[in-house]
Amino acid sequence: MEQTLRDGLNDQILSIEVSLIRKFDEQTSDVPDILKLTLGEPDFNTPEHIKQAAIKGIEENFTHYTANAGMPDLLKGVAAFMKTKYHLNYDPASEILTTVGAEEGVAASILTALNPGDKVIVPSPIYTAYVPLIRLARAVPITVDTSDTGMVLTPERLEKAIEESGGDIKAIVLNYPSNPTGVTYLKEELAALAEVIKKHHMLAICDEIYSELTYGDEPHHSMAEFAKENTIVINGLSKSHAMTGWRVGFILASADIIKEIRKTHMYLVSSTSSISQKAALEAVTAGIDDALEMRKEYQKRRDFLYEKLSTLGFEIARPNGAFYIFAKIPAGQIQDSMQFCVDLAKKAHLSVIPGIAFGKEGEGYIRISYAAAMEKLEEAMRRMESYILGK
């Protein structure tokens, strides 16, 4: 067979599949009257005062390159935001970097941190982006099953994974509150993990994009609270301020690490959109508490779905953050998550994401996004009930 130019492309790219989340969402779009609870897209609009700040920036012709790390005022605003919200102290001049969404923050951090052959612990089920990015860096992802420990990584499980992999672990990737499970870590759980991370001189790459969407009495805690020198914190405004399309994220780390990540960021994207940065500055200052009303609504939706799905026989590790339910398919139903979701879409015209999209440890589960109006969720549960009960 004649070789094509494609055959000579980066072998890691050729071996990576398109995100199953996007793939499945597109596949079910053609089903008539389909009701989709598939994507992590807030159904709220960006707050008006943030949009007006961007409009003002356009009118004032703030439409040129900014500094690679971001506008100085924005970096100061992010530093103040993180200190107020999470009691973290970072120097805006040397320890914070503005990125094109948290996704670029994750990619730039991974590509900067890892060498070929480095081993990286990844608790699973896990968001789809991390493992492909680790492989692009030609590092080795080591997934650790958390489905039997409440969807959180315990210090004991982490120690066991380090031992079984032969030690010499370079990094761990943590996402909390979690996509897909909605589960987050308590303060004491993070503190215990931090001790293991420091003991083994590991780097913790922490995606905390859902930090403003936590439910219950305990607020979000960052790994940097317990192991700042070991931690790269990635955050942003997509979920907290309903700004997914604005593409603004942040990386916070020690100055020597930020200095190196900045090189990767510079050659990937140069800088974040100037207008998006104007909007972001408004978000982290005047909009510091914009997430509160959204959080209240998300919590109502979470409680509704949790109760309805539990009644139908789904087992759920109670989600304390983000806007996802990760539910174990009831006994007596199709246990292959892909087959279950395809059948559900065909028969009930309801689209949710198969758990296998989040690693083999997610098999037998489905992910439901409740970033949707309550009326839509109520109809979704009517369809789910009809399907499960065979009506």
Predicted regions, residues:
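PLP-dependent class I/II
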Residues: 1-16, 27-31, 35, 39-57, ...
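A short acidic, glycine-rich active-site loop
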Residues: 61-65
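Conserved N-terminal alpha-helix of the aminotransferase class I/II PLP-enzyme fold
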Residues: 66-100
